């Protein structure tokens, strides 16, 4: 192999330069031309070269910077000539089509790739066409063939790629190197580092990304890069997006703004992909280049062709990254606008990278003495970027650790809501989940100790609590003996249990088994079970049965209600057991429900909605901070509390009509008052477009919308959390404060509350009411307050009914207090 390279300042001096080149005879001659000349002038140069060397194969592309013997030169033409002794060449040109794989097949077919093909050098007319599939070439045996090269750079004289004596546009030109004696080595260097936070792809169409984290991607790029609306192309490609871990270097290059909106990328991202901005500084590759130079020297490479990214010149003001390669072998090449790299068995399209193709003809010689390589230059840039990279890594680790701690704490809190604190059994929440999958041949029994209140009053709460644990063990033993692995036991109240089990038994047989168990249990003296101070303690049980075959279409709540109603019926009629299927619909209950529906309907028609307000006070000072506005209806002079009618009308058309009247009355009374106030929104309100439009108009009518708070009850009735979050975010933009109500109640989906990002969270009264007596409840409340602080939300303690509860709540760090101790609801005048 013989190699020589020359610089040509201009076309006029080309003849003089060519006369100085005396080429030896060889099997093949490859002339690579890298030049800022126009298409017409470079064709003249090509014809001049072919007139002197008609057998030569010419290949090249437009550029403004070339690499000549390891040095960077600007605005000159480089001729790089290689004479091969044992290698033959093939050439190809392929116009682009929409089928990238088909383009690759045509390119491989024209190049006649075989098992003797060692490498391909290819230049593409435009960076946008650098798609991996277009350059993933294989020989006739299906083995991959490395492809090096890149995309032509736009110059003031135009952009072109050259093959022999013709320039091409919208095409790729290539030559293939074939020869058993030819050894090639490929490599590349890039050090893309993720910068900043992680974004999630939330809207994408093909190769266009429209939104990250539900925000237009153009706005995110403009904000982070400090760019104008047009987003310069150089800026875009300098900051691609990285998916996954840094070590994978999985990059997505923004190609430009799309007319349809969004940014177009070199390959498509998927919905929900997580990405980060990344940035590369070429000085980070220097150490790796020096290591590669040592390896190439050991392989006795005779020629190195470098295809470098033009953007690297913005950072590499010297030729440090080229010096070690030039010390190994003559190093020539050009600066491209995108680079092709074959590494680790895969063809890749690189950006912001330096790639090389090193060659040798013949075997390694033992008599050659290696030339010492230059010393590695010391500098501060590489250590600085390493420090920045590790700082980001440490920050990510801290964030992950904090997230794990919050998840662990949340799991503990969530688990405490799913377990009964007295018995340790799964509670009503878990039972409801189980009943959601109530299947054939399954049965539900609701069970209660009917004399438990008397036991508590006579023997005290410690004795009662111990009895609950002992009874739970007795029930579990019975179930394990009779229905091993086919039953579950749940605590659904104080002295109340439920069991779900599978058995091919009818109601009569189940009644018989239960009766025998009750007869046996009621004659047990529980003194041996840890009650030494009790001479004799007996219990009385009753139960209600629901079988799936009788109530196949009922919801979990209805199933449990049916079982409890059957149990109550048994107790009221002095029985141990009642099958819900035997109960007839109680006409009085139905009539009462119809009566309430009639009264509410009458109140809505007459617009007899009454607004009450209860103060919410600042902790410590007890100054009124706002009012919670509460609905009442007036019927024939009687003020009716919502607990009497809301449960009945929840699933009817009356509910949304009542909500809109409540909104109207509340805003009419509060519009000209100075105090802040809040109203309650149910899941039905959040799903009603008419109610939401009515509420929006009311908020806009207030001079200061920041006075308005919207209390959202986060419950299992919410089916579409995305819609709820969307609605709340909309009202937040109008100025309203988003408040989560009853947090910590039997149902709280903490993940969704985190996504909702409320400004205020109200702790459920069931947690606060007994914190002066129940230490465990107090600890749970304390943890919830801390969790709210992590979420950057203010907290309100509800049901503050005495001074002790008030003081404890303040000590826990709540921001506001609400309850009878501070003020009862009163009618707004």
From Swiss-Prot:
Superkingdom in the source lineage: Bacteria
Reported consequences of knocking out the gene: Cells lacking this gene have a level of c-di-GMP almost four-fold higher than that of the respective parent strain. Disruption of this gene also results in increased biofilm formation.
Keywords, alphabetical: c-di-GMP, Hydrolase, Magnesium
EC number: 3.1.4.52
CDD domains found in the cross-reference section: EAL
PANTHER family: CYCLIC DI-GMP PHOSPHODIESTERASE PDED-RELATED, CYCLIC DI-GMP PHOSPHODIESTERASE PDEF
UniProt protein name: Cyclic di-GMP phosphodiesterase CdpA
